[in-house]
Structures are given as structure tokens and as C-alpha cells.
From Swiss-Prot:
It comes from Salmonella paratyphi C (strain RKS4594). The active site is at residues 11, 130. This is Imidazole glycerol phosphate synthase subunit HisF. CDD domains: HisF (cd04731). HAMAP family: HisF.
Length: 258
């Protein structure tokens, strides 16, 4: 059995790490490189960096900080933000990233997933899915351009349909960003995670809602996710990664101990 992964998420805007609630009202957390090093030293299995306004601004993630991060950490990291072409991805990978993640550009051009997977291998390609539960319809819908609240829009895709579509096109991993839960720290949306797990054959990463160590345990135990991504509980030092891993190991979760 592969070890479950603990993955701090660093949302990047204007060269700094920020954090919002339900993808809104972002506050500045700190500088990118020191935070990355701190999480690596604490025992994170992987880091994810989202340049949250790159897609909505029509640009690619700033590659300069990617190289600086690669110099100071020795764990895998994934970078997302406005990647629209093989050339964009190649440059980010050449600067030291281990994976690239695409979200809004994949919705605009689903063939991008296949082209990237064919060029770099599925193990490098993560598809991020920003999913929102609509109380009125009782359905989960995929949103696009969520880094800019003035441009965010609901797409034609229901979440489960898009999960299946991206797998068919070559996604090697799926990061499910549950917008309703983002930043509120009241637990992952286990109902949605279980539904996605039923149709997801590739590694599945849960994102949005972690507030306690028990929330991580529930995601691993009840929804069988492969990794749990979180931001505010780590940024605000509510949970220490080493202590979290010790707790999970004590609960029988297969995890890499620091």
C-alpha cells in the first residue's frame, strides 16, 4: 500500500503566499521560499503552489520563484497557474517542479490534458477541479477562473462527469478543490469525496475544509483519498505536520513518518 500524503498548499499572488475563504478575501501569509522550506523541514510529503490569478490574468506562473523553491527543498512539488501549452509546462518543469497542474486552461481546451500527458507522462500531470455544491440544484458543478472573483464562472460540467472526462484524456492525478469548504476548517466534504472516489481510478487529492487532525483521518479512512491538501491550518500553525503524521500513524494510517 502506498503511503498517504500530507500536502501543504501555497496560493501565490503578486509574489507572496495568500489565503482566502471560499476563494475570496485573500490575506497575505508570507514569502514563498521560507514557507516552502518550513513545510519541507516539518515533514510535508509534497507541496502544491497555485498562482491563483495567472489563468484569469491570461499569463503563466512566474517561473523565477519556482527555481528558488527547488533550491531549498528536497521533496516533490507541483506548480499551477496559466499553463496553456507544452512550452509553458516544459519551462516550469525545467526550473525544478516535479509536476504541473492545470485547471481553467483544461476546461478551455480539454485536449491540453492529452498533449501534456503524451509529452511528459501522466505521472507529471495533475488536473485541479474547483467544485461547488449548488444548494438550489443539489448538484456539484465545476467552476472556472476561480482566482479572480470578478471572472469566476460556473461551467457546463457537473463534477463527476468532468472527473471521468479528465481521466480519459490522460490526467495522472486529480486534486479536488471543494470550494464550499475552502478555508472554513469544518472538515472535508466526505459525501462528495466518496462519490468522486467511486469513479476516480487515479490518485485523488482532497482539498478544502481541514481544521483538525480528525478531518485528515476521515478523508483517508472514510473516502480513501491518496493525499490530503490543506493551507490555513498549516499557515496559521494550528496543526504541526509532524504531530499530524504521528497521530495518523497511531490511527493505523499508512504514512511516512518524519
Amino acid at each position: 500500500m502506498l503511503a498517504k500524503r500530507i500536502i501543504p498548499c501555497l496560493d501565490v499572488r503578486d509574489g507572496q503566499v495568500v489565503k482566502g475563504v471560499q476563494f475570496r478575501n485573500h490575506e497575505i501569509i508570507g514569502d514563498i521560499v521560507p514557507l516552502a522550506k518550513r513545510y519541507a523541514d516539518e515533514g510535508a510529503d509534497e507541496l502544491v503552489f497555485y498562482d491563483i490569478t495567472a489563468s484569469s490574468d491570461g499569463r503563466v506562473v512566474d517561473k523565477s520563484w519556482v527555481a528558488r523553491v527547488a533550491e531549498v527543498i528536497d521533496i516533490p512539488f507541483c506548480v499551477a497557474g496559466g499553463i496553456r501549452s507544452i512550452d509553458d509546462a516544459a519551462k516550469i518543469l525545467s526550473f525544478g517542479a516535479d509536476k504541473i497542474s492545470i485547471n481553467s486552461p483544461a476546461l478551455a481546451d480539454p485536449t491540453l490534458i492529452t498533449r501534456l500527458a503524451d509529452r511528459f507522462g501522466v505521472q507529471c500531470i495533475v488536473v485541479g477541479i474547483d467544485t461547488w455544491f449548488d444548494d438550489a440544484t443539489g448538484k456539484y458543478h465545476v467552476n472556472q477562473y476561480t482566482g479572480n472573483e470578478n471572472r469566476t464562472r460556473v461551467t457546463q460540467w457537473e463534477t463527476l462527469d468532468w472527473v471521468q472526462e479528465v481521466q480519459q484524456r490522460g490526467a495522472g492525478e486529480i486534486a479536488l478543490n471543494m470550494m464550499n469548504q475552502d478555508g472554513v476548517r469544518n472538515g472535508y466534504d466526505l459525501t462528495q469525496l466518496k462519490k468522486v472516489r467511486d469513479v476516480c481510478r487515479v490518485p485523488l487529492i482532497a482539498s478544502g475544509g481541514a481544521g483538525t487532525m480528525e478531518h485528515f483521518l476521515e478523508a483517508f479512512r472514510d473516502a480513501d483519498v491518496d493525499g490530503a491538501l490543506a493551507a490555513s491550518v498549516f499557515h496559521k500553525q494550528i496543526i504541526n505536520i509532524g504531530e499530524l503524521k504521528a497521530y495518523l500513524a497511531g490511527q493505523g494510517v499508512e504514512i511516512r513518518i518524519c
